[in-house]
Amino acid sequence: QPHRHFQLLRRSKFEISCPREKWFLEMKSNNISDCSLKKNIIVSSFNFLENSATLYELYLELSEKLGLGHPINDEKPRFPYNILITNNWIAIIKRSYDHIHGFSINSLGFAGYLLVTEKSDINYLRNYGPEKLLESFV
């Protein structure tokens, strides 16, 4: 990963965090990995407002479980990844690719905010849908 950045999405207390929040919450409670997308994502409950001091430890634990490594043993992560942190849950997505079918997907893409540009293969998206597009990145 050549760079890292945060993207903050402000939400009111009872507003959903992202369009795919229900999907992430269902993944958290269901360990069935019926597609490569689900096999490369780890989701955990986390109360950010009450436990912000332990966020880094949870991040390290989840990163190791997903096979990304640990800063003590690995100079850099073993795989590129994206991370989503809400007030109630955290998700880490292990990626294999940065660009596919003219799309560049970051954390917001996995959250449900796909950016379509003139380079994007809109026909691929129409024919296979967003889930298949996201799956091709892992």
Residue positions per predicted region:
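HIT superfamily nucleotide-processing domains
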Residues: 1-138
